Amino acid sequence: MAITKDDILEAVSAMSVMELNDLVKAFEDKFGVSAAAVAVAGPAGGAAAPAAEEKTEFDVILKGAGANKVGVIKAVREITGLGLKEAKDLVDGAPKTVKEAMPKADADAAAKKLIEAGAEVEVK
């Protein structure tokens, strides 16, 4: 007759703390695993938890073209790879998102390029 889960649970519940410690060490050795507890921090507050998450993707938003519209169109073309007409339409339709879901460094570089061209930019 095979040993069932209930038989194992009954045997484990009858063991002392020292015997359980030895059993855990035997499992670690036999199966090459660690029984160390993983500490998981829960959210500190209900509504405040999402705000505590660090963003990894950012959107570059063109608020306005400023005085140097041609330079801003060129910068938009460099950043997005759009054609001349599409880039002009994007600049004319400001405020518009220039590029979405960019890493922080790329978003900052794109924003800097647009600002240098004379645009008003926001990174979200």
From Swiss-Prot:
UniProt keyword annotation of Ribosomal protein present: yes
CDD domains attached to this UniProt entry: Ribosomal_L7_L12
SUPFAM superfamilies in alphabetical order: ClpS-like, Ribosomal protein L7/12, oligomerisation (N-terminal) domain
Pfam families per the UniProt record, alphabetical: Ribosomal_L12, Ribosomal_L12_N
Superkingdom of the source species: Bacteria
Keywords, ordered alphabetically: Ribonucleoprotein, Ribosomal protein
HAMAP family xrefs: Ribosomal_bL12 (MF_00368)
Family recorded in the similarity comment: Belongs to the bacterial ribosomal protein bL12 family.
Name of the featured protein: Large ribosomal subunit protein bL12
Biological source species: Ralstonia nicotianae (strain ATCC BAA-1114 / GMI1000) (Ralstonia solanacearum)
Lineage, top ranks: Bacteria, Pseudomonadati, Pseudomonadota, Betaproteobacteria, Burkholderiales
